[in-house]
């Protein structure tokens, strides 16, 4: 069980200079939470995902049956939307938004949420920068909790190059996506059979292949319906440290995921649904990972099988 208290204050300021329009916005947010037991979580318990299983000591007491709570203002945020001059036939715009989340276990520091520019030619648009991961999409739970439905709903903001084409009521989205704050999980060391894990950018960097997303949406007033396909490929290790030597290894874990969504709104109510078949989507705050299926007896090179989940 968790309890959240939200106090928001938002506003906007307009300015204009040499063909640019600026709209400043922000909010003051406070979060008071209490959890009845230990959980899988981030941000010191503020970003709740799911309760941890029982872990009994010799006396039968649950080590995870301990409550916790705190009060934070980390998600107070500031932002600016910029509308720029025409660039050829394209309308230009940009966004910068930050909060005080920090990174890892270092809190109360500026953190980038959204930073991108967008070129809009009418039917087609190109976005370059960091914004919501395409798997987050236009259909997500509307709740006070910061996790927005994770680990069932993918949650991530990621650097990307995204192209959208709109014709009549249909919109095609194609994106190449990298990782920055929300990362893949991999082995903590290069020893064969290592099961301790860590989150790191190295697994995607060494892969040299971004994530790819392709989706289609049907939109009309009050209705959104669509589906998307996502592919990711990471490199867990490039070296294997055996007892005798250090070997170069070429390892890769590739996963294909899919999602479908629908949202209908009318006057003061809405109905929405979304399903995700995910393969190793730890970088989107969902349940994921992969297991070792075989280990080479000489080099320690490992084969893997990704974890698939459905929500």
Locate the predicted segments by residue.
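Intrinsic-disorder/low-complexity loop/linker signature
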Residues: 56, 169, 193, 299-300
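Bacterial Sec-dependent N-terminal signal peptides
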Residues: 1-17
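Detector for outer-membrane/organellar transmembrane beta-barrel domains
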Residues: 222-311
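Outer membrane beta-barrel
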Residues: 17-44, 54-183, 208, 213, ...
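Short, conserved aromatic-histidine micro-motifs
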Residues: 50-52
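Outer-membrane beta-barrel translocator domains and adjoining extracellular loop/strand segments
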Residues: 38-43, 105-111, 138-146, 184-202, ...
């Amino acid at each position: 069980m968790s309890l959240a208290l939200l106090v928001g204050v938002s506003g906007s300021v307009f300015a204009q200079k040499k063909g640019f329009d600026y709209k400043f916005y922000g909010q003051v947010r406070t979060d008071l939470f209490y959890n009845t037991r230990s959980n899988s979580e981030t941000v010191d318990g503020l970003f709740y995902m799911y309760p941890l299983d029982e872990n009994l000591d010799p006396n039968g007491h649950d080590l995870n049956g301990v409550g916790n709570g705190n009060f934070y203002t980390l998600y107070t945020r500031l932002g600016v939307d910029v509308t720029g001059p025409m660039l050829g036939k394209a309308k230009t715009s940009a966004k910068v938004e930050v909060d005080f989340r920090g990174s890892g276990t270092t809190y109360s520091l500026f953190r980038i949420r959204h930073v991108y520019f967008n070129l809009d030619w009418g039917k087609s648009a190109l976005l370059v920068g960091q914004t919501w991961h395409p798997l987050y999409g236009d259909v997500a739970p509307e709740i006070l909790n910061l996790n927005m439905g994770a680990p069932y709903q993918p949650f991530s903001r990621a650097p990307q190059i995204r192209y959208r084409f709109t014709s009549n009521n249909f919109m095609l989205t194609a994106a190449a996506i990298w990782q920055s704050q929300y990362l893949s999980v991999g082995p903590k060391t290069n020893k064969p059979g290592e099961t301790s894990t860590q989150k790191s950018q190295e697994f995607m960097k060494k892969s040299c292949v971004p994530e790819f997303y392709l989706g289609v949406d049907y939109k009309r007033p009050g209705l959104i319906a669509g589906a998307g396909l996502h592919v990711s490929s990471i490199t867990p290790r490039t070296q294997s440290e055996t007892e005798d030597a250090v070997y170069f290894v070429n390892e890769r874990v590739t996963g294909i995921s899919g999602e479908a969504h629908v949202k209908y709104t009318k006057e003061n109510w809405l109905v929405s649904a979304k399903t995700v078949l995910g393969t190793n989507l730890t970088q989107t705050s969902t349940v994921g990972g992969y297991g070792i299926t075989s280990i080479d007896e000489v080099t320690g090179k490992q084969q893997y099988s990704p974890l698939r989940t459905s929500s």
